[in-house]
């Protein structure tokens, strides 16, 4: 189990055999690779300063498979105060193009659209962001690990 709380929850359910606290592999990986990610350009690649932008990721079906969801995404992107970096997942871009909304996204002021980035480059962007807007549980968790709201 990743935490003592998880072990305690199992104990209360009567499950104790073979249960051990081993930590969270995602946390361990995030901490292991953070120093390596710190060597990447991060926000400087977009002419931005650490803490001076919002990072956005969106790719899940619930956020991209209906026109209403896509229009909501466009509205959120337009409402973010200040610079925003949005590495666009191919699925998300395809859905925005299909809905005829991609051109509108490209016109949003202070929005830096980028192709998808690898883990280390993404971590460099994440750790230096002022805030994160995402539909990804993994990104939410990593933002928490790095004290990004």
What residue ranges belong to the model's regions?
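A short helix->loop->beta-strand "cap" motif at the edges of active sites that frequently abuts
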Residues: 16, 82, 148
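Donor-nucleotide binding loops and adjacent catalytic segments primarily
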Residues: 38-128
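A nucleotide-sugar donor-handling region in carbohydrate enzymes
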Residues: 1-68
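Short beta-strand scaffold positions
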Residues: 1, 21, 87, 133-134
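A donor-sugar binding/catalytic signature common to diverse glycosyltransferases
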Residues: 122-149
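Phosphate- and divalent-cation-binding pockets in alpha/beta enzyme and binding domains
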Residues: 9, 29, 94-96, 142
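Alpha-helix N-cap/helix-start capping motif
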Residues: 4, 24, 90, 136-137
């Amino acid at each position: 189990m990743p935490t003592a709380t998880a072990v305690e929850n199992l104990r209360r359910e009567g499950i104790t055999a073979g249960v051990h606290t081993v930590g969270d592999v995602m946390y361990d990986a995030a901490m292991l690779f953070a120093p390596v990610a710190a060597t990447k350009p991060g926000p400087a690649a977009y002419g931005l300063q650490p803490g001076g932008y919002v990072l956005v990721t969106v790719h899940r079906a619930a956020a991209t498979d209906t026109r209403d969801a896509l229009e909501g995404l466009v509205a959120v992107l337009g409402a973010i105060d200040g610079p925003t970096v949005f590495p666009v997942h191919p699925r998300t871009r395809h859905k925005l193009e299909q809905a005829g909304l991609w051109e509108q996204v490209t016109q949003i002021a202070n929005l830096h659209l980028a192709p998808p980035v690898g883990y280390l480059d993404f971590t460099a962007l994440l750790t230096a962001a002022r805030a994160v807007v995402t539909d990804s549980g993994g990104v939410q968790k990593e933002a928490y690990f790095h004290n990004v709201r």
